[in-house]
Design a protein with these regions (language model features):
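Active-site ligand-binding patch in enzyme domains
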Residues: 2-69, 73-177
Length: 177
């Protein structure tokens, strides 16, 4: 599957997964936080999503950790971890990435897979554009064992910026001759 087909499939899947709002949670705006959202995300998330803006010369970071009811912290299908497809498209692949300059994952997440860490629902793609950001965030992949470049979509899309974080031994092995 080429990158254009991958993007079209992900966007179509996200568009089909619109759901009604999740369980209502009362949340106050954290001090100094920046509100992110549009009418669509506010309806599904029940309000704004808040992120900490960068301060001084330090970047802003957001970390998404998930845990299933049985205590599992990893899954091949993120929608299996709690809120189903709404959580997957609105939070996991949505609001947590929409304002990001970069998204980071471990090599196990992308190794041999057809994955790009981005937003896919048309409303989120539009929100990202309204924030003045490029279509896809920079992809950061951390690995201690290296990656087979030919097996990972994320490493084979010239217009997709990728930063690979590894140890010197593997950096030397992955450098083209």
């Amino acid at each position: 599957m080429d990158f254009a087909a991958f993007v079209a499939k992900k966007e179509a899947d996200a568009a089909r997964r619109s759901r009604s709002g999740a369980e209502r949670i009362s949340r106050a705006r954290p001090a100094g936080a920046m509100a992110i959202g549009n009418d669509w995300t506010r309806r599904l998330f029940d309000g704004d999503f808040y992120v900490s803006p960068p301060t001084g010369d330090r970047p802003s970071t957001s970390v998404v950790f998930v845990q299933s009811k049985d205590g599992n912290t990893g899954a091949t299908n993120p929608s299996a971890l709690g809120g189903g497809e709404t959580d997957k498209h609105v939070i996991y692949e949505g609001l947590s990435r929409v304002a990001a300059d970069a998204v980071m994952a471990g090599a196990g997440t992308i190794r041999g897979g057809k994955i790009v860490l981005s937003v896919w629902h048309p409303e989120l793609v539009e929100l990202r554009a309204s924030l003045g950001l490029p279509r896809h965030p920079i992809q950061i992949v951390a690995t201690l064992r290296g990656l087979p470049f030919e097996e990972s979509l994320i490493l084979n899309v010239p217009e997709l910026p990728v930063i690979l974080v590894t140890i010197p031994t593997w950096a030397a092995l992955m450098t083209p001759i």
